[in-house]
């Protein structure tokens, strides 16, 4: 999705192909090694500390690289979190485009929307600290991934004949906001299964499917 820049270049229209890691220019061995060290260190930091408090100095020290090396790749900790999320989000995007139903093509739109919710919640459950570090506040709406999700949900709404699909898109993506999921799981004590069942029910109600 990127070469260390702030956000990925994702397809945000059905006619464009995803830019996957396999299509990116090959890195030099030392650059690839540094990137791997940075991401491995960041994975640990984001999973053990408050993402909002992580600094570039901490990341550089944990990765065993110089500050200049870190800043050449990433402008801030949020960009590092984005890089860690990229691989997981690419896989979900690939499944939406060409995977088996109901996540991929071939199922009714309500079932596909429900499957998307379940997959996205699973992603949040596994990588919530990263999501909180990368996709909270206004940054969520400008991310390439959010643009991709918007196009996908809109296509399902149109297929399902939902009136005024453009007004529904962001309302339907709101349950997947990392801050909301964190509140539901860690403040309200809701299980991931309970949240998933609720949003799957919402998907089918919107599409008027039983």
Q: Which residues fall in each region the model found?
A:
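Hydrophobic/aromatic-rich alpha-helical bundle segments in the mid-to-C-terminal region
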Residues: 131-143, 147, 157-206, 210
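Alpha-helical DNA-contacting segments of helix-turn-helix folds
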Residues: 81-88, 127, 131
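Hydrophobic alpha-helical connector segments
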Residues: 83, 94-126, 196
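Basic, helix-initiating cap at the start of DNA-binding domains
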Residues: 1-49, 53-62, 79-82
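Short amphipathic alpha-helical elements of helix-turn-helix/winged-helix folds
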Residues: 41-45, 95, 123, 175
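Hydrophobic/aromatic residues within well-ordered alpha-helical segments
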Residues: 77, 84, 88, 92, ...
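Short hydrophobic/aromatic patch on the recognition helix
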Residues: 64-74
